[in-house]
């Protein structure tokens, strides 16, 4: 959770929307390979008009003390989160996309969007489990010489991502945890 002051009512509304739209009960295999009796399909919220607006607003509030020019992460989970932040009220913040690997054709880029040379960036994710997705994006950005100031996520599953991200020397913030969704 963020140490910054965020709108409590907006956060509660987002939690309700995610419970309604994105929590799917039934056995699933997570990206970590572990089994769970529910799945949080946050894309159902990040691609929902009202929830997306709340996500953009709240993540801007949660990271207001971090200095960054652009926001993005590993495609696909990070894409709508980044654009929600980009379109939220406030200063101009560009968005970018990090591919899992560089394209084999065209410009053969791994990082798409505006030129990030000399820019500071925030890496985002819809849901963190192991921290591998945001750290894959962090590695690609660092390899390209881009400074990453932190990682932020909509929902943290409390399965160690915070520790893995901290081990990379990055601060980490989340809007919601499992208890906020009635899943602890």
Curated annotation (Swiss-Prot):
It comes from the Bacteria. Signal peptide: none annotated. Pfam families: Pribosyltran (PF00156). Orotate binds at residues 129, 157. GO terms for molecular function: magnesium ion binding; orotate phosphoribosyltransferase activity. Its cofactor is Mg(2+). 5-phospho-alpha-D-ribose 1-diphosphate binds at residues 99-100, 103, 105, 125-133. Keywords: Glycosyltransferase, Magnesium, Pyrimidine biosynthesis, Transferase. It catalyses: orotidine 5'-phosphate + diphosphate = orotate + 5-phospho-alpha-D-ribose 1-diphosphate. Its EC number is 2.4.2.10. NCBIfam families: pyrE. Homodimer. PANTHER family: OROTATE PHOSPHORIBOSYLTRANSFERASE, URIDINE 5'-MONOPHOSPHATE SYNTHASE. Belongs to the purine/pyrimidine phosphoribosyltransferase family. PyrE subfamily. Catalyzes the transfer of a ribosyl phosphate group from 5-phosphoribose 1-diphosphate to orotate, leading to the formation of orotidine monophosphate (OMP). This is Orotate phosphoribosyltransferase. It comes from Corynebacterium glutamicum (strain R). The lineage of its organism: Bacteria, Bacillati, Actinomycetota, Actinomycetes, Mycobacteriales.
């Amino acid at each position: 959770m963020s140490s910054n002051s965020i709108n409590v009512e907006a956060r509660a509304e987002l939690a309700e929307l995610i419970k309604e739209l994105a929590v799917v009960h039934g056995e699933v295999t997570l990206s970590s390979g572990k089994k769970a009796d529910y799945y949080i399909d946050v894309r159902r919220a990040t691609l929902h008009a009202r929830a997306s607006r709340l996500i953009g607003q709240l993540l801007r509030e949660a990271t207001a003390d971090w200095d960054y020019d652009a926001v993005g992460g590993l495609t696909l989970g990070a894409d709508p989160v980044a654009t929600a932040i980009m379109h939220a009220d406030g200063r101009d913040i560009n968005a970018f996309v990090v591919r899992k690997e560089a394209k084999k054709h065209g410009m053969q880029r791994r990082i798409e969007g505006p030129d990030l040379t000399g820019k500071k960036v925030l890496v985002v994710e819809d849901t963190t489990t192991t921290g591998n997705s945001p750290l894959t994006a962090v590695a690609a950005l660092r390899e390209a010489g881009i400074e990453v100031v932190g990682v932020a996520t909509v929902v943290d599953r409390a399965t160690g991502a915070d520790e893995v991200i901290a081990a990379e020397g990055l601060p980490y913030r989340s809007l919601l945890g499992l208890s906020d969704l009635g899943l602890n």
